[in-house]
A protein has these predicted regions:
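N-terminal recruitment modules of adaptor/scaffold proteins
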Residues: 1, 32-120, 124-127, 132-134, ...
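Short acidic, Gly/Pro-enriched loop/turn segments at secondary-structure junctions
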Residues: 3, 14-28, 130-143
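Residues located in well-ordered beta-strands
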Residues: 9, 14, 125-127
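Short N-terminal edge-element motif at the start of the domain
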Residues: 1-9
Length: 178
């Protein structure tokens, strides 16, 4: 079934590996409009899937990035879902059994990053970010290189947007407007 979803309608992107010989290449994407909507999968067997995945990722950054920065500047929070399940549960996700997943939330504000797992990180202490799609783990580091928070890249929905926002916040320290 074909359905058109405009880029601005995509709220969550999940990138992962599929197939036996993918090594560290994230070759598959799933996306959804919101938490109550179904996931749509782009598998590597679709012609030009790699280009389509990059376009969707980049369009999310272009559309949601400025919105998220404005929300943060207005003293709001931007939420990201993440998975803390075992690999067997993640396999349910990969097979399309999305109802079996237990999503948790990260809440990012201009001042803090808070997680459902009880992590509380003051943004002013974050001086570096490491990781990304070529790395297994995203780490927020203090000025001495000590990890303040980490999350597996493949467990964080819209991980590229999260990374872009943190990088921007490190470089620009968002002033709060009221």
């Amino acid at each position: 079934k074909n359905k058109f979803i405009p880029f601005e309608g995509i709220s969550d992107i999940y990138r992962y590996r599929s197939g036996k010989y993918t090594r560290k290449i994230l070759n598959t994407m799933a996306f959804r409009e919101n938490i109550d909507k179904p996931w749509y999968k782009i598998s590597p067997n679709i012609a030009h899937a790699d280009r389509l995945i990059e376009v969707i990722k980049n369009e999310q950054l272009l559309f949601r990035g400025p919105q998220a920065l404005n929300t943060l500047a207005q003293d709001g929070t931007v939420s990201f879902s993440y998975l803390t399940e075992s690999k067997s549960k993640i396999r349910h996700f990969l097979r399309g059994n999305f109802l079996m997943m237990n999503e948790k939330k990260l809440r990012l504000s201009a001042r803090t990053l808070d997680s459902d797992d009880g992590h509380h990180v003051p943004i002013e202490e974050v001086h570096f970010i490491s990781g990304g799609s070529n790395s297994q783990t995203i780490k927020l580091l203090d000025m001495h290189g000590r990890a303040l928070f980490s999350v597996p890249y493949t467990s964080l929905f819209s991980a590229d947007l999260f990374i872009a926002l943190i990088e921007h916040m490190i470089q620009n320290r968002i002033p709060i407007r009221r």
